[in-house]
C-alpha cells in the first residue's frame, strides 16, 4: 500500500519548485516480512525551450529525497534446519533455531535518493522523456542482527514517450532498467491510449509489460508479465493491473499473480497560464 502527494510552485518565468511526500507499507509471505518507509522530496524544474516562439516545450527536472524506513518479520513463523526432528520426520518448533535474532524489527534508518529527468513535448500527443536516479546513496544499515548489513546503492534509468497513430489512438512505450550490485532488472512495454474528441477529457489505456531479471547462474529470464488498464478523467486516473508470474516462483505462489489498484488525483491549474505541459506516463 502506498500514498503520495506533491505540490508545484512557480518561482519565476519558466522555473518551478516542487515538494512531495511518499508513504509506503508492504508485507508478504508466511513470515509477514514487511517494510514501511516515509520520505519527503524537493525538486527544481526549469523550462529550457518552448513558449511563445517555439512549438516544442522542453523541461529539465532535478530532485532529491530524504526518508526513514524500517523492516520487520515474524521469525517465529519460520523453521530452520536445526528444528527438524529426523526421528519423527517433522519440525519441532520447541527446538532452538540456532539463529541470533535480536528482535522482529530493524532499527530506523535514514535513506537518501536523487534523480534527474529531461522531457520534451512536440505536440499535444507527441512527447519523449529520459531520466535516471540513484537510491540508497548512503547505503543504510538494515540488519536484524547485531551486525552491519548495508543496503547497496541502486541505480535506475528510464525513458518513454507518446506516439500518435491517427486522430484517436496513440502508443505510450516505456522502459526502465535497475541495477543493484550484481542484480539487474528491466521492465518494458507499451500502453495503447484511445480518446475521442466527443469524450472531452476522458481517455482509455490498455497495455502489457514484461519484467526481465538476471539469474546469476542462468542469465536473463522472463520473470513476470503485467496487464494494465487505465481510465483517464479530467482530474482523476483510475488504474488496474495484474501480474502474471512466469518464472519458477510459480512453484511457491501456485501461479497466482498480484492484483493492484491505483488512484491518482491532479488538482487543476488556476489558469491556463499557470498550467505546465507534462508527458503522459
List PLM regions with ranges.
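Subset of outer-membrane beta-barrel
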Residues: 1-281
Amino acid at each position: 500500500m502506498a500514498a503520495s502527494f506533491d505540490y508545484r510552485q512557480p518561482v519565476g518565468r519558466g522555473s518551478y519548485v516542487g515538494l512531495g511526500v511518499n508513504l509506503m507499507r508492504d508485507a508478504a509471505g508466511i513470515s509477514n516480512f514487511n517494510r514501511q518507509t516515509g520520505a519527503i522530496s524537493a525538486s527544481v524544474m526549469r523550462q529550457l525551450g518552448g513558449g511563445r516562439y517555439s512549438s516544442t516545450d522542453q523541461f529539465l527536472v532535478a530532485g532529491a529525497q530524504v526518508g526513514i524506513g524500517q523492516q520487520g518479520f515474524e521469525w517465529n513463523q519460520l523453521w530452520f534446519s536445526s528444528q527438524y526432528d529426523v526421528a519423527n520426520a517433522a519440525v519441532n518448533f520447541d527446538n532452538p533455531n540456532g539463529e541470533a535474532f535480536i528482535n522482529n524489527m530493524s532499527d530506523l534508518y535514514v535513506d537518501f535518493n536523487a534523480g534527474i529527468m529531461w522531457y520534451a513535448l512536440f505536440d499535444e500527443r507527441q512527447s519523449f522523456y529520459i531520466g535516471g536516479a540513484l537510491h540508497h546513496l548512503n547505503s543504510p544499515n538494515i540488519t536484524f542482527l547485531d551486525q552491519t548489513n548495508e543496503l547497496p546503492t541502486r541505480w535506475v534509468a528510464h525513458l518513454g514517450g507518446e506516439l500518435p497513430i491517427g486522430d484517436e489512438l496513440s502508443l505510450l512505450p516505456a522502459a526502465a532498467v535497475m541495477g543493484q550490485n550484481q542484480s539487474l532488472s528491466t521492465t518494458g512495454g507499451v500502453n495503447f491510449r484511445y480518446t475521442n474528441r466527443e469524450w472531452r477529457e476522458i481517455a482509455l489505456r490498455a497495455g502489457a509489460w514484461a519484467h526481465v531479471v538476471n539469474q546469476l547462474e542462468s542469465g536473463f529470464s522472463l520473470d513476470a508479465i503485467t496487464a494494465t488498464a487505465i481510465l483517464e478523467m479530467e482530474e482523476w486516473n483510475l488504474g488496474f493491473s495484474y501480474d502474471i508470474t512466469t518464472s519458477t516462483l510459480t512453484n511457491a505462489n501456485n501461479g497466482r499473480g498480484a492484483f493492484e489498484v491505483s488512484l491518482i488525483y491532479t488538482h487543476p491549474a488556476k489558469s491556463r497560464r499557470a498550467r505546465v505541459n507534462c508527458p503522459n506516463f
